[in-house]
Curated annotation (Swiss-Prot):
Cellular component GO terms, alphabetical: cytosol; nucleoplasm; nucleus; Shu complex
Region (Disordered): 1-33
Name under which the protein is recorded: Zinc finger SWIM domain-containing protein sws1
Organism: Schizosaccharomyces pombe (strain 972 / ATCC 24843) (Fission yeast)
GO MF annotations, alphabetized: zinc ion binding
Zinc-finger ranges (SWIM-type): 143-203
Keyword annotations from UniProtKB, A to Z: Cytoplasm, DNA damage, DNA recombination, DNA repair, Metal-binding, Nucleus, Zinc, Zinc-finger
Entries under InterPro entries matching the protein: Znf_SWIM (IPR007527)
Gene: sws1
PROSITE patterns recorded: ZF_SWIM
Function (record text): Involved in early stages of the homologous recombination repair (HRR) pathway of double-stranded DNA breaks arising during DNA replication or induced by DNA-damaging agents.
Subcellular compartments: Cytoplasm; Nucleus, Nucleoplasm
Length: 209
């Protein structure tokens, strides 16, 4: 398979060289689909040069990362290329790398989705934001993603949701300010490559992919 912008080894090397590795690169990772092994306190303080509440959960940290990514993207002029911004803006590249380390088990498939340009937002109604997406590999293979109600129709999402005991932990209070997790009440919202790709595209919706 031919590699695209976000999956090529040379592109990843250039991104690594254009900005220092974030603190998150030192954290351990497991195969658990709910993201373990992240020191929330240290990572929160390192994130975007901002001091966050030491009690921050990984969910709130990821939300802050995505919000910061979106803020940086919105500062760019129209028709700015995502790939160019990643190579030229150190702060943006650092945010991108932080996400790639946190989601190490899902990053490559999500980047393949971005490269294929197979995912797009569904039509919006008045007052809606970009939360409903569709990934279409071919006419017989469509996946629906909803970032508000935190759902994906793919088999990976269903498997991860029911395979993780932490999906059934005591629910957390709903926080409308958190980007990651939507209305899901779990401390560790279920992850799949489609959810990740859609979340990144929503944050960078004004950039040229």
């Amino acid at each position: 398979m031919q590699q695209g912008h976000f999956t090529s080894n040379s592109y990843h090397s250039k991104t690594l060289n254009s900005s220092s590795l974030p603190v998150s690169s030192k954290f351990s990772h497991t195969n658990d689909p709910d993201v373990e092994g992240v020191d929330n306190d240290s990572f929160s303080k390192a994130l975007c040069n901002k001091d966050l509440d030491p009690s921050s959960t990984i969910r709130s940290v990821i939300s802050s990362l995505l919000d910061s990514l979106q803020d940086k993207a919105l500062q760019q002029s129209p028709n700015t290329s995502l790939s160019k911004l990643l190579l030229e803006d150190q702060d943006f590249g650092s945010l991108w790398l932080s996400l790639s380390f946190i989601f190490c088990n899902y990053w490559q498939p999500a980047m393949l989705i971005l490269d294929s340009k197979s995912i797009h937002p569904l039509p919006l109604t008045d007052g809606e934001v970009l939360h409903r997406w569709e990934c279409e590999v071919d006419s017989n293979n469509k996946t629906t993603i909803d970032l508000k109600y935190w759902y994906c129709s793919c088999s990976q999402f269903s498997y991860n949701a029911f395979n993780s005991s932490r999906s059934f932990d005591e629910p957390m209070p709903k926080n409308e300010q958190e980007t990651w997790g939507g209305r899901c009440l779990s401390h560790h919202p279920t992850i799949c490559s489609h959810i990740l790709a859609a979340s990144i595209l929503r944050a960078c919706h004004n950039l040229v992919i």
